[in-house]
Swiss-Prot record:
Its EC number is 2.4.99.17. Keywords: Cytoplasm, Queuosine biosynthesis, S-adenosyl-L-methionine, Transferase. It is an enzyme of class 2 (transferase). This is S-adenosylmethionine:tRNA ribosyltransferase-isomerase. It is found in: Cytoplasm.
């Protein structure tokens, strides 16, 4: 399948550069995955589309301040490091710029020596394996020296790094935020619980592979980078209970979707406690086994994320919705607006 089938025209001014002042004030497009019908709402209207007995699945990963600026100890050139994945102990898979200046044995110093890294080898797609040395607690030092790893299409400086975290972020380990969750406030989540909507939490640590452009000409030639996921026995039991009682499982974001669909694929359609690495790639033709609805942002043209949404809601429906979003001047990408995609997605229906 040609990746150009997932292209659309996006004016640059619709790429959101900063988050809205209030998380929940973003717009919400509601898309019926069966009919392609569209409604234009605000995010707080999600309360009217979720019902007692439904379950929202949220990814509680926490973004690391994963971008570090350092200098080579000899001869002092500036090096930028982006942490991607912890391998074991203090060894990490990273991206470095400029990569040609970092060879095996190169030592990089950060924060006037508070943190040091030695290159121990190369990694996939031009990456580098670095082993860090420090006194103290690694994540405390990282919190002090690191910057939030905003996507390259965001040019503005982020004033408040908490705005690139969900309010329920807990398990540190992501190189990017699960952005569909950025719209929720603690108050909105509490209102959903009061309505009888269950909240279930999983973890998938987001790597840059999710956002890397598809370089192949056809979808089938593209391979996803693996990302770590975990679902507890408690969450699995809750999801199965919801299913048994006729409720819907609504994933918040493509990361939650990938986690549940990975587990269901690996366990004959069943949801159970599991941990591991997933490189699942969902595009039209994929048959969903676990989810009934999806809350997600508006994604990049020709990205694996728009392919996932197209697998769930039909490519023609999704591209029509995206063209409508452009026409109505929705905000796109990480700090942009949201979609709710489900069957019979009408306000107040059950």
């Amino acid at each position: 399948m040609d990746i150009n089938l997932f292209d659309f025209h996006l004016p640059e001014e619709l790429i959101a550069q900063v988050p809205l002042e209030e998380r929940e004030t973003s717009r919400l497009m509601v898309l019926d995955r069966e009919t392609g019908d569209i409604e234009h709402k605000h995010f707080t209207d999600i309360l009217s589309y979720l019902h007692e007995g439904d379950c929202l699945v949220l990814n509680e990963t926490k973004v690391m301040p994963a971008r570090l600026h350092g200098v080579k100890e000899d001869p002092g050139a500036h090096i930028e490091v982006l942490l991607l994945k912890q391998e074991e102990g203090d060894k990490w898979e990273t991206l470095v710029k400029p990569a040609k200046r970092v060879k095996e044995g190169t030592v990089i110093s950060f924060g006037e020596g508070k943190l040091k890294a030695t290159c121990t080898g190369t990694a996939d797609q031009g990456g580098r394996q670095l082993e860090f040395s420090y006194d103290g607690i690694f994540y405390e030092i990282l919190d002090e020296l690191g910057e939030m790893p905003l996507p390259p299409y965001i040019k503005e400086t982020l004033e408040d790094r908490d705005r690139y975290q969900t309010v329920y972020a807990k398990e540190i380990g992501s190189a990017a935020a699960p952005t569909a969750g950025l719209h929720f406030t603690e108050e909105l989540l509490e209102k959903l619980k009061q309505k009888g909507v269950e909240l279930a939490f999983i973890t998938l640590h987001v790597g840059l592979g999710t956002f890397r452009p598809v370089s192949a000409d056809t979808i089938e030639e593209h391979h996803m980078h693996a990302e770590y996921y975990h679902m507890s026995e408690e969450t699995a039991a809750l999801l199965n209970r919801v299913k048994e009682n006729g409720g819907r499982i609504i994933t918040v974001g493509t990361t939650s979707t990938r986690t549940l669909e990975t587990i269901a694929t690996d366990h004959d359609g069943k949801l159970c406690a599991a941990s591991g690495w997933t490189d699942i790639f969902m595009y039209p033709g994929y048959e969903f086994k676990a989810i009934d609805g999806l809350i997600t942002n508006f994604h990049l043209p020709k990205s694996t994320l728009i392919m996932l949404v197209s697998a769930f809601a039909n490519r023609d429906n999704v591209l029509h919705a995206y063209n409508e979003a452009v026409k109505e001047k929705y905000r796109f990408f990480s700090f942009g607006d949201a979609m709710f995609v489900a069957s019979h997605a009408k306000m107040g229906n059950k």
